[in-house]
Amino acid sequence: MSVFYPIHCTDYLRSAEMTEVIMNTQSMDEIGLSPRKDSYQIFPDPSDFERCCKLKDRLPSIVVEPTEGDVESGELRWPPEEFVVDEDKEGTCDQTKKENEQ
């Protein structure tokens, strides 16, 4: 003999409520765009362009001063002088090892 106990599932109730909301909402055809200025626009408003240009004139400029490591021509030196010195030292170490082996 089986006994059936009704199980109250809150997830089922939530899905039923969502179905009701979906069925009672307006379709996209019924929703009209409002003529407000902040509605979606593909092209910018010309008055916004003029306002932007006025603000653009007020923006501060960024000045970057050269540091000691910068080259005056603007070119980067690669490898840096520090690495070149280290490589020379490694080269002399390798030569010394070869001479010791012979």
From Swiss-Prot:
Any one cellular-component term (Gene Ontology): cytoplasm
Keyword Mitochondrion: no
Domain LBH residue range list: 18-101
Subcellular location: Nucleus; Cytoplasm
Predominant subcellular localization, coarse grouping: nucleus
Highest taxon of source: Eukaryota
Entries under Pfam families matching the protein: Lbh
Gene Ontology terms: biological process: positive regulation of DNA-templated transcription
Key words of the record: Cytoplasm, Nucleus, Transcription, Transcription regulation
InterPro entries given in the database record: LBH, LBH_dom, LBH_dom_prot
Keyword Transcription found: yes
Family the entry assigns: Belongs to the LBH family.
Function noted in UniProt: Transcriptional activator.
Name of the protein: Protein LBH
